[in-house]
Structures are given as C-alpha cells and as structure tokens.
Amino acid sequence: MALLGAVALTACSGGGSSSENCLVFGEVPAIYADYQAQRDKIEESAQKSEASYKKASSQIDELKEQYRARIEEAGKKLDGQPIEISTGEDFKVVSPVSLSFKEFANSVNSMYDVKGDIETAKDINLDVTESWLRSHDVQYLMLPLMLIGCDEQGTEVTSARIGSFQGFKVVDGKLVLPTGTKAKLETVPYGDNDYDNYVRVKSVRLALDTKKL
C-alpha cells in the first residue's frame, strides 16, 4: 500500500467515557462501545426461558433507540468540523474535508458523507508489471483512498475507506495518476466496536490502496 499523506488529529483520551472525542468520528466510538457493553450485560443476565428472552429483547430494543439518539446527536456534531490534513507533496486539499452525519444503515451502525475536495498535487507513479498493463484497461481502474490510524510506533491499527481515485493513465509504459485528479469522496460507516483501537491511535494518514495492482 502506497502511503500518500498524513492527517493530524486528536486521539481518544482513554477510559471508556462516552463523552470522549476520538479522531474523525468524535464521540461516536465511545458511545457505540457503551451500547455494546450494556447490550452484553442484558444478554448475559437473561435466564434460559422464553419469558426472560422476551424481556431481554424488549430491553435491548429500548436500549437501541436510546443509543441511536445519542449516536445521531454525536454524529451531527461532526458536521462542518474540518479535519486538519497534512497532505505532503502528493495531495492538495481544495476545500476542507469533514464528515456529515447521513443516516443509520441498520441498528446503531451510522453512516457519514465525506465532504470537501482532495486532488493529486503531482503525478503519482505506481509500480506495475508490463504483463499487468497488457491485461488491464486502466480507464476503468479505480483505487480506494483510505484513512489509516496509527499507534505511537506508527503501526496501523484502524483503516476506513473515505473515497476513491479514477483517471489513471499509461505514460511511457508506466501507470500514472495525473496531477490534478480529484478524489471521489464517499460515505464512510461506523458500525464496528473499534473503540479499543481508536484509543491507541496517535496519528492518521491517507493512503492509496493498491491491493488491486
């Protein structure tokens, strides 16, 4: 995977409080973790009888509605809050990048539109073999743009797809993403209990996912 930039963000402070402000998702990871913990307690306390399961199911439905409201409130706080991006020499931020709460995909899994504009600041050359070039029509090639969270040692601990790039060219037998190519920013979900990973994140960077190559 080719790493193409860096994002300077504030990591979670630790401790599991639902008011903690974690990375681009703000308070959402901590609230989601609270929901999972409360749901687990209800499920564990249910006795092995039809009546107890019905009671637990009702409690979980009520819990879900309460936490959906909290997650939506926290998600809407992200609207218009720019992410400070250190783009390096590969990217240029044309307009500030931020998240905007969109909807719930299901249950308490929330979706966010990625707003703003990012484009390449120079030609980006990608290593591929001649046989790969002969067997692929690059006009249809699309590569994801990833947001990678790293711990204190620089090890990747979280990743999220925030967009994609198209418009690749073959120049002098090499695969190139030309200067000025705009990223198509997409919708990013938060629906995994990644709180423990976000607590460890100390820095975030952008990366072009080149697994397809």
Per-region residue spans from a language model:
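Short amphipathic, basic-aromatic surface patches that mediate peripheral association
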Residues: 118-136
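C-terminal motif of bacterial Sec signal peptides marking the signal peptidase cleavage site
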Residues: 8-11
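Transition segment at domain starts
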Residues: 59-119
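Amphipathic alpha-helical coiled-coil/heptad-repeat segments
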Residues: 24-67, 74, 78
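Sec-dependent N-terminal signal peptides
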Residues: 1-5
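Short, solvent-exposed, Trp/other aromatic-anchored flexible loops in extracytoplasmic proteins
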Residues: 134-138, 144, 150-213
